[in-house]
Every structure is written in structure tokens, then in C-alpha cells.
A protein has these predicted regions:
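Active-site phosphate-binding strand-loop segment of PLP-dependent enzymes
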Residues: 190-247
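Short, conserved active-site loop motifs that form the nucleotide-linked donor/cofactor pocket
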Residues: 139, 235, 262-263
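Conserved core segment of the aminotransferase class I/II
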Residues: 259-290
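Short catalytic/metal-binding and nucleic-acid-binding patches
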Residues: 1-60
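PLP-dependent aminotransferase-like
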Residues: 155-210
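N-terminal "arm"/small-domain region of PLP-dependent enzymes with the aminotransferase-like
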Residues: 61-115, 202-203
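Phosphate-binding glycine-rich loop
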Residues: 121-162, 180
Length: 290
């Protein structure tokens, strides 16, 4: 036990339901918390998960980090309450259980987990291709759509070829840019949060457009995105369609991959397909890009 102001982290006991951020409960009297076995005082570090490094330990270990890693701000997820029948809008998880047939298929695949998976993911790519109306050679699977985005940026961006994206959009784009030393061209959204896609015409930069955009939910017509693709013939346009299945029919830009060689459409199984925990994503493009 130390003197001074105490921060709080949970022990293995179950933390009671708290809707107010836990730092509001930090008290200048450590003895008050010391009498409650549900909590353990930690000095001088901030609230953290049990088993994580302390601030002092991280500072000591950071001498090994690259400058890029040392400069990164850690990702702070939203509060993850473990309650039944809870719809977690902050995580955008599907609240409904999978169909019985899906659960049975997953259970039936368990014995095969002792074997390495097919590196080409041929069966999965074939099934996705049928669903999207393309050929298996147009599909590349990844560990969630984030890996597909990472691979695309590594392939088509560098210190001399920036990534252009909206200022209010998926927050992982700038993180990837920082990790890969990619310059960022941030394009402001309009007052109503819409995208003026004419600002993306002729940029000669790699472009990523979340459609529908997150968190604004606004959908761009396929024709408007096609004009971005058409006016950037020497650059890759990535269309991130994580939420496309909620946008209605004929909203996807997948058909553009049959018409243009510079467009990549990224989708995920995490949202409408109810497989966030499986981490399965894929992208659609011409075979030469795949």
C-alpha cells in the first residue's frame, strides 16, 4: 500500500455495473478503496486491465520501440459490458445469434482445426465469389477487413504516394498510415457530414472511401464513386463496404471491379454476417491486383 492518490483496477472479482466512467470514482483517500476487496490500488499508473504492463514498465521497455511505435497512441475500445441481451452500438456487433445451420457447420468444422488451413482459402473464395457474382480469382480473404486494408496500403502507398480519406470516417485509416509511414491527405466533409466526391477527382493518390461512411452512415451512389475511379486512372480507389448490406439493393461497388482495373472493394463478415469473432474479411478486384 502506498500513499497518495489511488487509481483503480479490478481484481478477478466481478466488477459491479458501472455506467459512469471509472475514473470518476477515483478517490484521494486510498483507505476507502483498500477496504473493498473488489478493487486493488495501483500507483502511479492509470486504470488498466489486470496483467497489463504499468506505465513505468512501458516507459522502461519503450527504449526498444521504433520511433513509429513509440509515437502511437494506444487504441482505447469502448466500454465492453458483459450483460445478456445487450445491443452494443459502440462495437457494432450483431445482437442476434447465428442461424442453427451456421452453428452446426461451425461445430462440424472443429475436428479439422488440428490441420493447417488451405493457404489459398479456395473453398471460401469460391463461396464468396458466387455471392458477389464474380470469379474466385477476384477474391482475397483476410483476417478481418482490416488486414485487407493493410495489405492494400502496403501495396499501393508509400512515402511519395499518400492516402486520401475523409476527416470523419473509419478511425483505423490514419493508424495504418502512421504504421506504414504513409502521408495522409485528409479531406474535410461538408457541414452536413456528406462527402463532396468532386474533391477526390484527379487526385493521383490512393483513395479510400467508406461507403456507407462510418460513423456518419451516409451512402454515396455507385455512380458518384465510379466518377472518382474514372478520374483517377493511375491510382487505386479502395471502397470500404463494411456496412454495405444495410444500404439496400444495388448499393455495392463490386460491379465496378468488372469495369475498371483500379478499384478494390473491401467487405467483412463481422457486421451483417454475424461473425465478428471469427475475423474474416475479403476484397474484390481484378486478378492482377489480387
Amino acid at each position: 500500500m502506498h500513499s497518495g492518490s489511488a487509481d483503480i483496477t479490478t481484481t478477478s472479482s466481478v466488477l459491479p455495473m458501472i455506467t459512469t466512467p471509472i475514473w470518476h470514482y477515483i478517490d484521494t483517500n486510498p483507505a476507502k478503496w483498500a477496504q473493498d476487496t473488489r478493487y486493488v490500488t495501483v500507483f502511479p499508473d492509470p486504470v488498466r486491465r489486470p496483467g497489463c504492463c504499468t506505465t513505468t514498465e512501458v516507459t522502461h521497455m519503450s527504449r526498444y520501440f521504433t520511433k513509429t511505435l513509440a509515437a502511437l497512441e494506444p487504441y482505447t475500445p469502448g466500454e465492453q459490458l458483459k450483460l445478456p441481451d445487450l445491443v452494443k452500438l459502440n462495437a457494432n456487433e450483431n445482437p442476434y445469434p447465428p442461424a442453427p445451420g451456421v452453428a452446426a457447420a461451425v461445430a462440424g468444422a472443429v475436428p479439422g482445426l488440428r490441420l493447417y488451413s488451405d493457404l489459398t482459402e479456395a473453398a471460401l473464395c469460391a463461396a464468396i465469389a458466387r455471392h458477389c457474382g464474380v470469379q474466385p480469382e477476384n477474391i482475397l480473404c483476410g483476417n478481418g477487413s482490416d488486414e485487407n486494408l493493410l495489405l492494400a496500403l502496403r501495396a499501393f502507398c508509400d512515402e511519395t504516394h499518400p492516402l486520401a480519406f475523409a476527416d470523419i470516417t473509419y478511425s483505423f485509416y490514419p493508424v495504418l498510415c502512421d504504421l506504414l509511414h504513409i502521408p495522409q491527405h485528409v479531406i474535410l466533409v461538408e457541414e452536413d457530414f456528406s462527402l463532396d466526391l468532386s474533391k477526390y477527382h484527379g487526385l493521383n493518390e490512393t483513395i479510400v472511401i467508406a461507403n456507407p461512411n462510418a460513423p456518419t452512415t451516409l451512402l454515396q451512389p455507385v455512380a458518384a464513386i465510379e466518377e472518382v475511379v474514372r478520374t483517377n486512372p493511375d491510382s487505386i480507389v479502395i471502397v470500404d463496404e463494411a456496412y454495405i448490406d444495410f444500404a439496400g439493393p444495388n448499393a455495392s461497388c463490386v460491379p465496378l471491379t468488372k469495369k475498371y482495373d483500379n478499384v478494390i472493394v473491401v467487405q467483412t463478415f463481422s457486421k451483417s454476417h454475424n461473425l465478428a469473432g471469427a475475423r474474416v474479411g475479403f476484397c474484390v478486384a481484378i486478378p492482377e491486383l489480387i
